[in-house]
């Protein structure tokens, strides 16, 4: 379950292509329509499905890099033996990120902002497209309570998408008219909202979803929280459909102040 992309390919272009193969991307929250997929994974933008993020470098797999000297270098499984096309002929998929040797050379490239070399293509791991998705939200005035629940959800691997937004960001994402919609939405929301999705796949999807929902209900009750199908006027289904695509224009992070600066605590 891997795809290979060149710089400049956007999430809007790649999402339907992998969907045709029954796959999906582990993508960041509402990237810009013009955002390069390769640029996103090289910058280590936080993804929405921590269940599948085994390492800080995920979902990046392999890369082809040209250094300032003009030397070509391939990281991970793509390093060889043979060219990439020769690897394809024998079933090589450029999925493992480590190597060549025992070193993790891809870590030199990620976060370097082009100072170490120019990436000409990258492969990234994809996930299976679920057959059933049941989204939920949990609102709270306490971030600590939601963090406790999130920790258990991820630890027990029961959810796919899983993230927390404050009222300002959630309102900014769904406000259609500024500033009227933004103020109205923000006032109707709790200070913090946890969103998560329970998914079922090929084998016994309904039973899987029902079982996870029951277990999560036990968790929320133990923590004094309650899962719901909507946060204020925003339904969980609407959130799910929105976050599985790139941001509409104008870019949601620019709506409030006209500019933004992302700071990732990795």
Predicted regions and their residues:
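C-terminal substrate-recognition/cap domain of FAD-linked oxidoreductases
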Residues: 137-266
